[in-house]
């Protein structure tokens, strides 16, 4: 087995059978949903970290002409197997559960200065570790290194775009759903932040919290169309240009670190549609030595070690844990 195939090995959960496999997929979906709520953090990063990224992309890609033909002929059993139905349902239920349960809590946490620092510190540790663990699976060369740099620059530019306040027409909501879901399945580029840039984040989060169905359904339809279209492109790239594609995705994650750096200072603000202040421009600053700083660093370290621990459970070749813990 060559290095590339060894690096790409992962536990196949496309057809879960045991309760533990279903639970793992549900919790993976929950982690993805929780991540996607936070502007600057990507659910795609969580999928990468937890080893289901390629399986997810291929499962979404399976909604094709063959799936339509099976549906028309009422071959339900074959259809459900073809589209990895059990995998998608378990993952999707976890994701939706996180969105419904955590939308209000994470929204409140993001509005609290201390809570935002702690939340971003934890996710900073997660993303930093994922750069190391996923990057270790790439066969590095001049081409892949250049791909990494391009990905990092693109992500850095995107996360530094100043958010706007947009209209909320059905067409705009539909397109926003398409763009956001595309970002969500790209590690490092946050779907929530794309909604923030387009001026839709507060509106959609409020709609979810208040169970306002029309805008939720419109955004959801856009997301379905967007993810079906983009998954085909990404699946092709992973199959044909695996190392280059993963290097770009790792670059996306690296470029996003600027956005989720925990300690920031607001340079310019404005009132949102609720009359609350919203920061339009900010800069990263050095933290003050305090109890909050110590707790934030602790959460950062926990996030960092958690990702490396989960990666080692899957591959036994984690660059951090493999020297201190060799599993049988």
Role assignments for model-derived ranges:
Residues 2-37, 45-186, 190-328:
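Multi-pass membrane proteins that catalyze or facilitate reactions on polyprenyl-/lipid-phosphate substrates
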């Amino acid at each position: 087995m060559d290095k590339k195939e060894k690096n790409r090995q992962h536990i196949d959960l496309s057809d879960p059978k045991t309760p533990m496999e279903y639970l793992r997929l549900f919790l993976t979906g929950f982690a993805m949903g929780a991540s996607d709520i936070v502007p600057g953090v990507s659910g795609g990063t969580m999928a990468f970290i937890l080893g289901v990224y390629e399986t997810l992309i291929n499962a979404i890609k399976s909604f094709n002409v063959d799936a339509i033909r099976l549906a028309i002929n009422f071959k339900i059993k074959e259809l459900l197997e073809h589209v990895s139905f059990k995998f998608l349902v378990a993952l999707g239920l976890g994701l939706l559960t996180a969105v419904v349960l955590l939308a209000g809590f994470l929204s409140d946490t993001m509005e609290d200065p201390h809570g935002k620092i702690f939340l971003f510190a934890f996710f900073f540790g997660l993303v930093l570790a994922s750069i190391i663990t996923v990057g270790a699976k790439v066969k590095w060369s001049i081409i892949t290194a250049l791909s990494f740099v391009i990905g990092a620059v693109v992500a850095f530019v995107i996360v530094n775009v100043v958010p706007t306040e947009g209209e909320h027409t059905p067409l705009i909501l539909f397109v926003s759903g398409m763009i956001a879901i595309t970002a969500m399945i790209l590690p490092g580029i946050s779907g929530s932040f794309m909604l923030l840039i387009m001026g839709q984040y507060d509106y959609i989060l409020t709609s979810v919290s208040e169970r306002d169905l029309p805008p939720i359904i419109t955004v959801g339809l856009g997301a379905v169309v967007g993810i079906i279209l983009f998954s085909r492109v990404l699946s092709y790239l992973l199959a044909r240009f695996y190392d280059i594609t993963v290097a770009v995705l790792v670059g996306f994650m690296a470029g996003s670190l600027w956005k989720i750096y925990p300690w920031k200072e607001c340079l310019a603000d404005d009132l949102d549609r609720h009359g609350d202040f919203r920061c339009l421009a900010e800069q990263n600053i050095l933290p003050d030595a305090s109890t909050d700083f110590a707790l934030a660093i602790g959460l950062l370290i926990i996030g960092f070690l958690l990702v490396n621990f989960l990666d080692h459970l899957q591959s036994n070749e984690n660059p951090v844990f493999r020297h201190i813990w060799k599993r049988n």
